[in-house]
Amino acid sequence: MPSRPLIQLLDTTTINQIAAGEVIENSISVVKELVENALDAGADEIEVETLGGGQGLIVVKDNGCGMSAEDVTLALKRHATSKIGEFSDIFSLSSFGFRGEALPAIASISKMEILSCPRIGEGSRTIIHGGEIIASEAKPRQLGTTISIDSLFYNVPVRRGFQKSPQADRIAMRKLLENRILSIEGVGWSWVSERQQEFHILKHRGFAERVGFVMGEGFMQEALRVDSGERPVCVRGFLGSPGFHRPTRSGQRVFINDRPVDSVFISKQIREAYSMLLPPQRHPVFVLKLYLPPEWCDFNVHPQKTEVRILKEEFVGEFLSESIGEVLARPQESSVSEKTIFSLPALRFFDEHLAERSSVEPLESISLPELSIPPKVPLPFLDKGQDIPTTDGQMQIDWGVSQEVRFLTSLGKIVLAEDSEGVHAIFTEAARKHLFYLALTENQQYNYKSQSFLVPLCLEVTPQEGIFLSSHVEDFKQLGIELSQMGPCIFAIDSAPTFIGEEELKSWILFLAAESHAKVDRKAVALLIKETLTQTVFCKTLRPFDISWLSLLWQIGKPEKAFDGTQIRRLVLDEDFIKE
């Protein structure tokens, strides 16, 4: 009996599922491929609907050229495409797709329905499960194609187990669609998520209006227009003013030949053009469309085509640096006319609701659940407390809070205390900060005052940051910060604790949203909120150290290190330390 060959030919379904592992990572990859197919089909109206961040349902509807039933069958075969005829066509691509892998790959890991009608001929409906066509029939439809994806990864449970949360996919989905809004003008876009309209952009909206929608009015009010060079090498777009910057590169949108790309090279060139205009570790915000000869660009680096190799990188770098440098050297006034900006409803919406919100009664002080620490001890920095009288630079206090530890003296920012183990040096700044952080994270039963603003503070954020803030409203509320969403990108701060100023509060929330909007671990984000709030409060605040807080340190185990690694306590073993 002949033995079975070691080398086996894979069946078509397995081949497509393997290809899907490279092309289709998640629901965002599916939508990306489907909307690119719609654009390549000449559509100027594209509608997207998702449920569960796309993990439950994806529907992409377009008014492109459509397909006959025969074309649909061919399109489901691997490496069947209408976009190239031979390999050399790859180096002069004008379409977004060309491999002919995406549709069969998606079909192999989902339950798919394709409803399509060409310009000449009748419409058809094709149902595919796991890559196999199970039904095909004539079905009326207007010109165009509708593709519905249900049960993504239903037959690849391992892949399904690695999917992120629906909330994370929703945030990434929005960025994907925003990039398409910016990259291609003359196309109308609609997105319905969780059965609610997220946006509807009319196709006649110009580039400046689209940038205003995606980046917000705050960006556009001081944006600097870039329009340098002529085809085939040119750059156009908008730069944020040097005063408009972020802690990460999340506010940067780069397009090369209308393809959204993530280019560290281009970001670095533009950051260097800003040079000393930005504070350290801050990044400029911009939307730039760079056009280069097709033969200079290789988008075939990765199946998702978000990376690009540039043939004449040095020339392109110099061109960008000079173009951006010239714009930044101009008198810094916004080069965008107010008339060119898409009239966003956000601020008007905020004004309409201001009257009904301005009469909010002051909130009761916020209570946090109990730990066994004497309630008479004030929480560090929640309350200024009483200044401790000093004589010759040393604190004089009637110590009686704890029998475990005894206050000795104060040496500037260091307090010396003694217990059965010996003499301890307490670094007061780190101790105060750590106790404050514990008060937030451990939910101790202490009250601190929360103030309600007569006129709520207004925050404008990006849509992705808006999704992040709206999903963590309860985490802010636990800290006495009341956030109300007034629109996709507008939030009102109704109340906040008295231990943080208004400008510090706004800056902290904006920083947090920009830094953390892509994070999905709710517990980690909740801790990050408290940690960054602690750092913000202590960065600006210098208040006297209450000696009674020593008792708290001992009751929590007299820690040596604070939550951020700074030293709180050190055992004094010799006189050299005191001299330091």
UniProtKB/Swiss-Prot annotation:
Gene Ontology CC annotations of this record: mismatch repair complex
InterPro entries xrefs: DNA_mismatch_repair_CS, DNA_mismatch_repair_MutL, DNA_mismatch_S5_2-like, HATPase_C_sf, MutL/Mlh/PMS, MutL/Mlh/Pms-like, MutL_C, MutL_C_dimsub
GO terms of biological process kind: mismatch repair
Keyword check for DNA repair: yes
SUPFAM superfamilies: ATPase domain of HSP90 chaperone/DNA topoisomerase II/histidine kinase, DNA mismatch repair protein MutL, Ribosomal protein S5 domain 2-like
Entry's Gene Ontology molecular function annotations: ATP binding; ATP hydrolysis activity; ATP-dependent DNA damage sensor activity; mismatched DNA binding
SMART domains tied to this protein: DNA_mis_repair, MutL_C
Keywords: DNA damage, DNA repair
Similarity comment text for this entry: Belongs to the DNA mismatch repair MutL/HexB family.
Function, in words: This protein is involved in the repair of mismatches in DNA. It is required for dam-dependent methyl-directed DNA mismatch repair. May act as a 'molecular matchmaker', a protein that promotes the formation of a stable complex between two or more DNA-binding proteins in an ATP-dependent manner without itself being part of a final effector complex.
Protein name: DNA mismatch repair protein MutL
This protein's encoding gene: mutL
